[in-house]
Amino acid sequence: HAYMNERGVGEAVKECGVPREEIWITSKLWPTEYGEGKTLEAIDKMLSRLQLDYIDLLYVHQPVGDFVGAWKDMEKAVEAGKVRALGISNFDASDEVFHTIMDNARIKPAVLQIECHPYAQRLEMREKVKPYGILVECWFPLGGAMSNGALLKDPTILEIAEAHGKSAAQIILRWHIQEGFSV
């Protein structure tokens, strides 16, 4: 919803010819949609825009506002079959907000989505959430918006890529996978 692409995604899913159960759909709740009661309504609207019966993974986009109330509604959506798994985005595992979710959740987050790439490795974060069984998924896996493509032009990465007959992007994505991150 935050990226205003749900209608297009829903149409693509319907038209692509691939069975729905073979497509993984992820979405995020915007902070203005947080709050017990309010979030369930937002999920229903999201599903309507997507023209789908369920979302595979739904994130709390940011740890602000009534994210605990949102989480309670997200759990209800899981129980109703509208959502399959829950995730948190932009939370820091050492912050109070992370522990607030963990202390209040009946259904624990399956995924923590954070910015990470070779310039922002976040390995400590991965280790902090590992005991909870939470997978770390990286946004900006090829480098942040402010990097202007620097990671893809990094001399060390280019040297490794050339030595292995791969592109810089392939080397970076391989690094993510070898480090145990989802991309």
Question: Where are the language model's segments positioned?
Answer:
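N-terminal binding-site loop/beta-alpha segment at the start of enzyme catalytic domains
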Residues: 1-23, 53, 76, 142-144
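Repeated polar recognition positions within modular binding domains
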Residues: 4-5, 31, 42, 91-93
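Glycine/small-residue-rich loop that forms an oxyanion/phosphate-binding "nest" at active or ligand-binding sites
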Residues: 14, 32-76
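Residue-level recognition of the N-termini of beta-strands and the immediately preceding loop/turn
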Residues: 21-24, 55-57, 109-110
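Generic beta-sheet signal
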Residues: 26-28, 138-139
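Beta/alpha (TIM)-barrel catalytic core signal, keyed to glycine-rich beta->alpha loops juxtaposed to Asp/Glu
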Residues: 62-183
